């Protein structure tokens, strides 16, 4: 039975107003570590051993049967695991409506938070940490347990900055030769077979995630990113990622062998241990003194630490009931005290080993400490004492650990959520200052791993022409909807967009356009007119929309940066010596917004080619022509849903196919069409027209919902475009004559005369340049 006492003030009249701490069983709650939808994690201190623990308090009434089963399976797995680099389970308490899981507390927080604050690790330190991670994962696999959610958020750091693997919520048992079919995990760390919905072997899934983790440790960024889940899925399936200039050849080789798309060709843990990069420091770093053996924590082997049992008996805890609890894997108060005392003894012995001196004193025994007394505060009045403690005199024996376990609760209440790194550890990691130079991206070549012999092909394989300039982490992808072009460099200013809201990972995502300065396409005719102060980025061939999910919330690029055009030839690596002048530095520091969350059903994420076009969005909102947004109920130019991503995703695919096929459309001037007089060259402007005195709409619009044009109009020079549209099951209609507008008028847009120079077009119209080289008298209808 769990008794949970709330904060209560002293009775009226005493005037002190003091509050008793919140208690759960033998634990005093100190503060909140984290909150979720159905659970809260509290930092607590055991009242007997004075050890800090983490208590996960779960409201079972708010969980469905599947999630409750997941919680019970996590507890079952943690009961079977005992490893120095895996979070230990101390106690499980359950009532009708609540579940309390008491685990080890890692005082230095998540590895993710450390990387966001300090930048990436040096390869030597990353190797030490990766050895610890690898040993923990190998231990799980040896016990036929697969984790399935390995990521830096689940790698905790204890007081010695050692790794502690946590969160077995997606973990499960597996058997060799029996594939699993639960497609779960965190998208940036998930293997390709999870996105494809294929059955998989558990260890191969964890090895892919280990490759992503090692990349993040060394580079400080994610190898696979994207503004939304479909884009991320596409990049994971392609298996392409960037290699920074500072990564060694051996480290690159190991990462590439782990991040192989084909699970059958993926490296194994035994091969990882024998890899040249790992053998640079072959021995797993450990304490100078021998640590406790695994059977000290195992409940059913019958071999327990006699010193811990002796201390418990000295404190008045029934030895027989403690042994029974350990044998039955009860994980009750008796077992919790034993495990916590075992941890304190381990810390004490390691401290004795590290203490300098020619002669070390023997370990203290409880029988040698009969002159000490145990404070009885909190024990005599505890409701568990009759069942937990044996009849003892008022003066009990206290071990030498009791003096170390006593500490003030007031100081612990003022500690931050994640403890700062000790000054003695300042030289362990490579500090990364948070400066604008460290927040820039690098246009680094991407490579596709094809065929066997990855290590042999590294020096000879030339990278494909890169058509993307994406940022290196999920939160660093520019959210501007860049125009879709063939592989070429597009020079445009950086933009920033705000995250969209209210979307799901499985649907096409809405976006909110941002103001964007004018930009020019990277054609030879226009590149000569560009100033040398324009920042350089590559146009992305993927969806330019952003995601509102916590996993993939994007942030805009840094604006205002003035760099010279890129003047280097991209090869196998970005740079092996020094950065070229004007080349933006590789991001070596994660951002808080890249924190990932685990998902079930990753196989349901649809690819880019399967997105359904409902209605195209406006060119104004996509290209940042103006901050104008159409009303939600307005049809016409914006279709049924303003700002819809689905329409533009398909339109961009059509335009990409048109560019790649090098289709040219030169409409012949219709005899009945009168040409408007050519005014002086001026920028092309589209703006909303309101009021009764507005000019009539022009006859040429990019719109949706218009009736299909008759076949004769499609036979006047539009056959190449029509054939390209048929390949995509899309009706692309081109005409030069005036067309009647639908009954419900679309949002009214005014434009200047159609004879404007194409160089004045804003960035959102770059991809339309090939369709209107002569005039703007041609409209394109996508239905």
UniProtKB/Swiss-Prot annotation:
EC number: 2.7.11.1
Organism: Homo sapiens
CDD domains: STKc_SIK, UBA_SIK1
The protein, known as: Serine/threonine-protein kinase SIK1
Keywords for this protein: ATP-binding, Biological rhythms, Cell cycle, Cytoplasm, Developmental protein, Differentiation, Disease variant, Epilepsy, Kinase, Magnesium, Metal-binding, Nucleotide-binding, Nucleus, Phosphoprotein, Serine/threonine-protein kinase, Transferase, Tumor suppressor
Mutagenesis / variant outcome for changing residue 209 to A: Decreased kinase activity without affecting much autophosphorylation status
Lineage: Eukaryota, Metazoa, Chordata, Craniata, Vertebrata
Domain remark from Swiss-Prot or TrEMBL: The RK-rich region determines the subcellular location and is required for cAMP responsiveness.
Location in the cell: Cytoplasm; Nucleus
Domain of life: Eukaryota
């Amino acid at each position: 039975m769990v008794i949970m006492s709330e904060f209560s003030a002293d009775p009226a009249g005493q005037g002190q107003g003091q509050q008793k701490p919140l208690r759960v069983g033998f634990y005093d709650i100190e503060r909140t570590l984290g909150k979720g939808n159905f659970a809260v994690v509290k930092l607590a201190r055991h009242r007997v051993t004075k050890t800090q623990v983490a208590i996960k308090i779960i409201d079972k009434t708010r969980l469905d049967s599947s999630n409750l089963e997941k919680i019970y399976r996590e507890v079952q797995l943690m009961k079977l695991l005992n490893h120095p680099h895996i979070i230990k389970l101390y106690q499980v308490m359950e009532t009708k409506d609540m579940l309390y899981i008491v685990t080890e507390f890692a005082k230095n927080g998540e590895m993710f938070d450390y990387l966001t604050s300090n930048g990436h690790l040096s390869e030597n330190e990353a190797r030490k940490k990766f050895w610890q991670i690898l040993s923990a994962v190998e231990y799980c696999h040896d016990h036929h347990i697969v984790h399935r959610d390995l990521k830096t958020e689940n790698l905790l750091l204890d007081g010695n900055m050692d790794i502690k693997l946590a969160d077995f919520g997606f973990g499960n048992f597996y058997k060799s030769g029996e594939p699993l079919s639960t497609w779960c995990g965190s998208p940036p760390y998930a293997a390709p077979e999870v996105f494809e919905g294929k059955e998989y072997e558990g260890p191969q899934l964890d090895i892919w995630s280990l490759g992503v983790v090692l990349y993040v440790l060394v580079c400080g960024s994610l190898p696979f990113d994207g503004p939304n889940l479909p884009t991320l899925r596409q990049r994971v399936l392609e298996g392409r990622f960037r290699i920074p200039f500072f990564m060694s050849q051996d480290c690159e080789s190991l990462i590439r062998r782990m991040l192989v798309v084909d699970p059958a060709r993926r490296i194994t843990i035994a091969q990882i241990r024998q890899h040249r990069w790992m053998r640079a420091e072959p021995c797993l770093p450990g304490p100078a003194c021998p640590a406790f053996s695994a059977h000290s924590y195992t409940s059913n082997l019958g071999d327990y630490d006699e010193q811990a049992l002796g201390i418990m008996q000295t404190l008045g805890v029934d030895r027989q009931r403690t042994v029974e609890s350990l044998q039955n894997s009860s994980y009750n108060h008796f077992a919790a005290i034993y495990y916590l005392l075992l941890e304190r003894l381990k810390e004490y012995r390691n401290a004795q080993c590290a203490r300098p001196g020619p002669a070390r004193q023997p370990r203290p025994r409880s029988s040698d400490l009969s002159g000490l007394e145990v404070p009885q505060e909190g024990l005599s009045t505890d409701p568990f004492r009759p069942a937990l403690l044996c009849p003892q005199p008022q003066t009990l024996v206290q071990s030498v650990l009791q003096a170390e376990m006593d500490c003030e609760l007031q100081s612990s209440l003022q500690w931050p959520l994640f403890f700062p790194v000790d000054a003695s550890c300042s030289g362990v990691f490579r500090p990364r200052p948070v400066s604008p130079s460290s927040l820039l991206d690098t246009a680094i070549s991407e490579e596709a791993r094809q065929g066997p012999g990855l290590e042999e092909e590294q020096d000879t394989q030339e990278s494909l022409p890169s058509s993307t300039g994406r940022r290196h982490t999920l939160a660093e992808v520019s959210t501007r909807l860049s125009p879709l072009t063939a592989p070429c460099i597009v020079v445009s200013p950086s933009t920033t967009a705000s995250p969209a809201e209210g979307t799901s990972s499985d649907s096409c995502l809405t976006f909110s356009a941002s103001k964007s300065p004018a930009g020019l396409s990277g054609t030879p005719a226009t590149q000569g007119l560009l100033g040398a102060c324009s920042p350089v980025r590559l146009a992305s061939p993927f969806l330019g929309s952003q995601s509102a999910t916590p996993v993939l919330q994007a942030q805009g690029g840094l604006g205002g940066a003035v760099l010279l055009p890129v003047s280097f030839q991209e090869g196998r690596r970005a740079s092996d010596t020094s950065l070229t002048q004007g080349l933006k530095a590789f991001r070596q520091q994660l951002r808080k917004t890249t924190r990932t969350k685990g998902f079930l059903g990753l196989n349901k994420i649809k690819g880019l080619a399967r997105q359904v076009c409902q209605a195209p969005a406006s060119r104004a909102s996509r290209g940042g022509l103006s901050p104008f947004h159409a009303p939600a109920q307005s049809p016409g130019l914006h279709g049924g849903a303003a700002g819809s991503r689905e329409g533009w995703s398909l339109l961009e695919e059509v335009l990409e196919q048109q560019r790649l096929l090098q289709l040219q459309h030169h409409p012949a001037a219709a005899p009945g069409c009168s040409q408007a007089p050519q005014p002086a060259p001026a920028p092309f402007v589209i703006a909303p027209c309101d009021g009764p005195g507005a000019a009539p709409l022009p006859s040429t619009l990019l719109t949706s919902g218009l009736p299909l044009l008759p076949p004769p109009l499609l036979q006047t020079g539009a056959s190449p475009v029509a054939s390209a549209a048929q390949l995509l099951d899309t009706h692309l209609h081109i005409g030069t004559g005036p067309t009647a507008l639908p009954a419900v008028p679309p949002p009214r847009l005014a434009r200047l005369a159609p004879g404007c120079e194409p160089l004045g077009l804003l960035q959102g119209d770059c991809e339309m340049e090939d369709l209107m080289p002569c005039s703007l008298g041609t409209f394109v209808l996508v239905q």
